[in-house]
Regions:
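Membrane-integrated ABC transporters
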Residues: 1-184
């Protein structure tokens, strides 16, 4: 396994249960849609155990993808043609269920975006040791729209203040009165 930098996108997971939503955010970004992991987590039904494949498929469809899960018992099926990037279900360290994005497959190496590590290249043998045989295939549907669903820090903060505008006005005027020394 070799870590490397390439032209492929990789959105890092926020915590151990975010690998599925991070993979979906990576594929969305690859297709021109920036969307926050928190939004995907909510739509996918991510809980303390993470996200199941059905939740990822549902979230992908809400983002404008056509998605389906497939399972194979033949590891060599990875060399057959299918749309990339795709999400692969893997088992890390023999126990941890995890998702990765497959960006490129050749007979010599498989390039993945691991939301825990970044862009990584595996030999097919290394990949077969961790892959469960499950893939989630995604293609943009005709309804897919490129764009940016993320909000900057200021807009998120401002959005929280809007419901408190009456309180903020009172604080503002009280501070002016206090500063002017109108009340001792």
């Amino acid at each position: 396994m070799k870590a490397m930098l390439t032209k492929y996108h990789c959105i890092k997971q926020h915590d151990i249960k975010d690998c599925g939503p991070a993979c979906l955010a990576t594929i969305s970004k690859q297709h021109g849609l920036k969307t926050p992991i928190s939004k995907i987590r909510e739509v996918a039904g991510t809980d303390k155990q993470g996200t199941n494949a059905y939740g990822l498929i549902q979230a992908a469809e809400k983002l404008g993808f056509t998605a389906k899960g497939v399972k194979t018992t033949k590891k060599e099926a990875i060399f057959e043609e299918f749309p990339l990037p795709a999400i692969a279900h893997v088992v890390v360290d023999g126990t941890l269920l995890h998702y990765m994005v497959i960006h490129k497959i050749t007979k010599k190496e498989i390039t993945v975006a691991d939301p825990a590590k970044g862009i990584v290249k595996y030999t097919p043998e290394e990949f077969f040791q961790i892959w469960t045989g499950v893939l989630i295939l995604l293609v943009p549907a005709p309804t897919f729209k490129k764009g940016d669903d993320t909000k900057g820090l200021f807009s998120r903060f401002f959005h929280l203040l809007i419901p408190q505008k009456k309180l903020l006005l009172h604080i503002f005027f009280a501070s002016i009165i206090y500063k002017q020394g109108w009340f001792h």
